[in-house]
Amino acid sequence: MADLKTRIAKRCAKEFQDGDFVNLGIGLPTQVADYIPDDIIVTFHSENGFAGIDAVATENPDVDIINSGGTYVTAVPRVKYFDTAESFGLVRGGHVKATVLGAMEVAENGDLANWIIPGKKVAGMGGAMDLCAGCPEVIIVMLHTQKGTPKIKKKCSLPLTAEKCVSKIITEMGVMEVREDGIWVTELHPDYTKEDIQAATECELHFDPNMKAMEEE
């Protein structure tokens, strides 16, 4: 399981270019910062109030540096700290290029459900609703299924975070773009066939004529 999540995080890291300002959600998205190439600078934003997230802290963490999910993280030397109002002003003002989020379900039209399973206690919506509305790109990183049940649906069954917001989905099986006419597979991991990824997906997938092999490195 860990290797599959690493695969997803490594591939997501390839989405960004030098100078990008990107929000990282909690969970799997935090791993993306670990795999940014050394020759580019990508500034990662955390909505609890800082820009300059680096890798997750594994030893002797600074207890004053946590991300929005409460995980200890490290910070780059150029880190900037600010209050929550300014943080969400950056998001709502469209100054954050993309957000990387996890998901429970994604619908074929780009609807996202990632904040609650009815009947289970959660802390609250968090910043996901604002991020989905304010960021030009919403990239979902997740395992393709949950205990064999497809997470990419015809229609979400869980309460929505936002409607028609997802632009790209990256799973262990491939990379998919959400377009007006559905979900298109643009990269397929060599471990899987077209039939495999379709069988693990509830909605119909479309395969881009220029589809290539999913690369991790």
Located regions from the model:
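N-terminal active-site beta-alpha-beta segment that forms phosphate/nucleotide-binding
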Residues: 1-76
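Conserved phosphate- and dinucleotide-binding cores of soluble alpha/beta proteins
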Residues: 3-7, 58-217
